[in-house]
Amino acid sequence: MKPAFELAAFTVRDGDEAAMLAERPAMIEALRQAFPGLLAAWLTKRDDGSWLDVILWRTRAEAETAARHVSDVPEAKAWFGHIAESHGLQHVDVADQQLFIPTLGSASEQVTGP
């Protein structure tokens, strides 16, 4: 079984960015509880101001199952309310991996800033 990434591109409603970021940790934890195959999550902001959510799943099947049932998780459904426009959801299989740093930081070391 190969791990897979889920890539979700979107824009955020005007004025919702701070709330979206503040609510994300609880939303991701709720997803982790609902879908044990969730291994890691990164939220990235693109140069054009849009966002790309990058989720690492144990398997593509677990990613696809979660995508079908994500709206059953109340925290996720509420968090999606911050999304102005979806630019698509994609699942991609990891073909090769080179893991040099097992973690980029704990929850207490989350990246913050501009």
Where are each of the predicted segments found?
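Residue-level preference for beta-strand/loop junctions
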Residues: 2-4, 35, 49
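Short, surface-exposed ligand-recognition loops at beta-strand->loop->(often short) alpha-helix junctions
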Residues: 11-22
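An amphipathic, aromatic/His-enriched active-site/gating alpha helix that lines ligand/cofactor pockets
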Residues: 26-39, 56-93
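Short beta-strand micro-motifs enriched in acidic
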Residues: 44-46
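Active-site-flanking beta-strand signature of metal-NTP-handling nucleotidyl enzymes
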Residues: 3-11, 52
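Short, charged/polar surface micro-motifs in flexible loops or helix N-caps
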Residues: 14, 49-51, 58-63
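Short, low-complexity N-terminal intrinsically disordered segments enriched in polar/charged residues
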Residues: 1, 22, 112-113
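Catalytic "initiation/cleavage/transfer" segments centered on a nucleophilic residue
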Residues: 83-114
